[in-house]
Amino acid sequence: MDYHDPYFFGYVLGFIHLLGTGAAIHALLTVRTSQGAIAWAMPLLFIPYFTLLPYLIFGRSSFDAYIKARREANKEMRAAIGSLNWRPWIEEAVAARRSDAYAALRAMPRLGNMPALANNKVRLLINGEETFGAIFQAIREAKQTILIQFFIIHDDNLGRQLQTLLLEKAAQGVAIFVLYDRIGSHALPGAYIDTLRDGGVQIKAFATRGGWLNRFQINFRNHRKIVVVDGLKGYIGGHNVGDEYMGLKPPLAPWRDTHVEVIGPVVACLQESFAEDWFWATRELPPLSLPDEFPEDGVLCQLLTSGPADAQETCSLFFVEAIHAAEERVWITSPYFIPDEAVSAALTLAVLRGVDVRLLLPSRPDHYVVYAASSLYAFDAVRAGVRVFRYEPGFLHQKVVLVDNDITAIGSANLDNRSFRLNFELMLLTVDSDFSSQVEAMLTADFAAAREISLQESHETRRLHQLGMRVARLISPIL
C-alpha cells in the first residue's frame, strides 16, 4: 500500500466514519435509554475519531453476553442455596406485611428480590471513625466467618489496619472471604492481595468477564459495600476502605458518609447478596450462617439489590416508588445528581403535591464533569420547586433517603444514571419511626451545614460555565 498516495488518508477517514456509523447503529439498538443512545450515536456519527475508542471501553451497555451469563450464574447460585433450608423467616415476613407504612410502598414486595422482614435491630453509623470502629470491633469478636465486600480497597493506613486484623482472625481459624471490584480497586497492589492469601484469607476480584476483555468492558462495576460477621451482624452503607473515608485526605476532607449496622433476619439477605457476587467470581458458595433464633422485636427491613442483569431497572424504580410514596416529605442525599426522566418527573410531582422535597449535594467536586452535569440538573430541580442544598464542610458521599416519618433507605446507590442502570448496588430499606427520627436529626444537622441554591444563582452563572454544564449534561447519560 502506498502511504504517500494522496487518497490514502481519505480512505482511512472514510473507513473510520464507516466504523463510526456501525457503532452508532449498534448504540441505537443496544443502549438501554433513548438519551444514552443519542448521546453515543451523535458523536459516533460526526466525530468518530474521538469517540470510537471510548465507546469500545465505556459503551456496549446492554452487554447481552454478560447479562445472560450473570443471570445463569444467579440461577445456579439459587439452586445451590436452595438445599440449605435458607430463608426460614416465615413469621418475620408475615409480620412485615402488617406494616401500614410499608404498605405505602406498594411496588416494593415485587420490585425487591428479597423479602421485607420484621424483628431487626439497626444502628446508625455516622462518618468513618464510627463506621470502621464498629466494623473492626465486630471482626475482632468473630468466631466462625467474615464476609467482606467493597468497591474500593486501598493499601493505605485504613487498608492495612483491615489487612492486619483479617490476618489475625485467619490465624485463629476464622473463615474469611473478601470480594473487591477490579475497577474500583485498580490501584490495589498485588502484594496486598498475596499477603492476605498467604495468611489464609480467600480474596477475589469481581469482574464483569474474565481475561483481558474485561479491560474494555468497565462500565459494569460492583459498587456494593457489605460486611457480615458470623451471620449475626451486618454492615451496609457508603464507605469504602481508604483514608479519604476517614476524612484524612484534603481537599475533600472532612468526608461525610453514613453506614448502618443491622442485627436480625435481614442479615441473611446480606449474606445472600454477597453469595451471589462471590458465586459469580468463583462458582462456589461461601459458608452461610443463620442464628438459632432472631430477636423477638425490632424494626422492619428490606434489602434491595439492583444491577444491570435485573429484568427491570430496579434502582431507578426504587427511587421513583419512594418519591411517589411521600405525603409530607422526601429528603435525599447523594454525591451525584444525574436523574433520568422518571426520577425528575417524580420529584416535580411530589412538589406539586405539596411535599417537602429536598436534595443535599456536595459543594466540592471529586469528578468535575459529573459535578458540572449535576449542577445543571440541580438548577432544573430548583426551578421545579425542589429545595437543593450544597454541603459545605467537606465532601458529601452519603446515600440516604428519608420519606415522611417512617421510611428510610441507606446504602450504596447514587442518584445518577450509573447507579440506576450500570452498577451493582445495595440499599437497606427500614420502616420504623424511631430510626427515622435518628436519620432526620442527622440530616437536619447536615442541612444546617449546607447552603441552599437559589434561582438567582442559576441566572448569575457565567455563560462559559453554563456552556460547560450543558456539554456535561449532554454526555451525562453515558457518565
Curated annotation (Swiss-Prot):
GO terms in the biological process aspect are: cardiolipin biosynthetic process
Q: Which InterPro entries match?
A: Cardiolipin_synthase (IPR022924), CL_synthase_A (IPR030840), CLS_N (IPR027379), PLD-like_dom (IPR025202), PLipase_D/transphosphatidylase (IPR001736)
Annotated compartments: Cell inner membrane
Chain segments annotated as transmembrane:
8-28, 38-58
Catalytic activity line of the entry: 2 a 1,2-diacyl-sn-glycero-3-phospho-(1'-sn-glycerol) = a cardiolipin + glycerol
Record's keyword terms, sorted: Cell inner membrane, Cell membrane, Lipid biosynthesis, Lipid metabolism, Membrane, Phospholipid biosynthesis, Phospholipid metabolism, Repeat, Transferase, Transmembrane, Transmembrane helix
PANTHER family given in the database record: CARDIOLIPIN SYNTHASE, PHOSPHOLIPASE D
Q: What is this protein called?
A: Cardiolipin synthase A
Please tell me the species this chain comes from: Pseudomonas syringae pv. tomato (strain ATCC BAA-871 / DC3000)
